[in-house]
């Protein structure tokens, strides 16, 4: 039987450990299992985070094994290799698909009935791999997608417009990567279209500002990696937000990456678009209105993903 308040994280690198810490702060689980090929690393992270429990929410966190996951409601997969200098994206895909081919069967043979949340990159490709390797229904396997990119987008817009980030409604969709796109046509603050709100705040050269903000969002990961070596806090908070919507059955709309079956004219790949996320998983993909230019950019993003996916299929 699934224990809705129990979760596991597979992979205790920067992202996995930061996600565990973020989940402790959220207080939505009573039990969290950390699994890593390096058992001592998982033990160390569990100890370090547990020592802060008196100042946070009560949550049992420990290093475990695949035998501990059968009753989890959620498994978060952050395990994967990082891209090395001179390595192509396809090289990275092949390495991480191989890692997933060792991880996913360990999950399925334990009778796991919960949700798989893929966070490892390239997340769109690896979500598709996890779906195919596991054989689970598509609702139960999805990825963090552009949830972080969307948070970056809203944050930067809020800074530019001097308004609370929670009052900014805007999405980044498509690939979690260079071909992602901003949905400007639907962006708004309190129902006021973003262009109109810019003028309300005294920004009349807003097209130039909007392009700069989009490029900053798209290139944020590169910039952060150049400055500090890796990104992990932001994505950890995105993971916790997704987990919260699952556990609390919020039906929150989040731009996760999941299998397309005709939506937006796409199928046979995973890509990020606004989706209702609940205890059922990626319950419903929403087809939001897009401008003609945005539709073209989404199709272009999907085409790039499909090309990589097709080259990777022999490894799945």
Where are these regions (language model features)?
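Rossmann-like NAD(P)-binding element
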Residues: 54-115
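Aromatic pocket-lining residues of Rossmann-like dinucleotide-binding sites
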Residues: 23
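Conserved small/polar residues in nucleotide/adenosyl-binding loops
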Residues: 314-316
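Glycine-rich Rossmann-fold phosphate-binding loop(s) that bind the pyrophosphate
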Residues: 12-13
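N-terminal Rossmann-fold NAD(P) dinucleotide-binding loop
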Residues: 16-17
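Mobile gating loops/cap/lid regions near enzyme active sites that modulate substrate access
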Residues: 155-266, 274-275
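Conserved N-terminal Rossmann-fold NAD(P) cofactor-binding segment
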Residues: 31, 35-73, 87, 306-311
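Rossmann-like NAD(P)(H) cofactor-binding subdomain of soluble oxidoreductases
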Residues: 88-154
């Amino acid at each position: 039987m699934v224990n809705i308040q129990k979760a596991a994280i597979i992979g205790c690198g920067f992202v996995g450990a930061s996600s565990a810490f973020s989940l402790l702060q959220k207080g939505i689980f009573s039990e969290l299992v950390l699994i890593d090929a390096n058992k001592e690393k998982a033990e160390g992270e569990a100890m370090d985070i547990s020592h802060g429990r008196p100042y946070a929410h009560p949550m049992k966190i420990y290093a475990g094994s695949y035998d501990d996951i059968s009753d989890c409601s959620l498994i978060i997969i952050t395990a994967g290799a990082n891209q090395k200098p001179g390595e192509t994206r396809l090289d990275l895909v092949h390495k991480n698909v191989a890692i997933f081919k060792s991880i996913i069967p360990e999950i399925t043979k334990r009778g796991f009935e919960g949700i798989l949340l893929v966070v490892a990159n390239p997340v769109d490709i690896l979500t598709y791999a996890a779906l195919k390797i596991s054989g689970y229904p598509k609702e139960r396997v999805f990825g963090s997608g552009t949830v972080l990119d969307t948070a970056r987008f809203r944050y930067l817009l809020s800074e530019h417009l001097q308004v609370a980030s929670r009052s900014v409604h805007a999405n980044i969709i498509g690939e979690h990567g260079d071909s992602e796109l901003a949905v400007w046509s639907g962006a708004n603050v309190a129902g006021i279209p973003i262009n109109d709100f810019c003028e309300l705040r005294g920004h009349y050269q807003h097209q130039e500002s909007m392009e700069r903000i989009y490029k900053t969002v798209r290139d944020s990961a590169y910039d952060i990696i150049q400055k500090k070596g890796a990104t992990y806090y932001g994505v950890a908070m995105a993971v916790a937000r997704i987990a919260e919507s699952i556990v609390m059955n919020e039906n929150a709309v989040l731009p996760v990456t999941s299998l397309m079956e005709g939506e937006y004219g796409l199928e046979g790949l995973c890509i990020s678009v606004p989706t209702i996320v609940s205890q059922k998983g990626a319950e419903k993909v929403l087809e939001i209105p897009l401008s003609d230019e945005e539709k073209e950019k989404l199709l272009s993003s999907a085409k790039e993903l499909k090309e990589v996916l097709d080259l990777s299929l022999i490894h799945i």
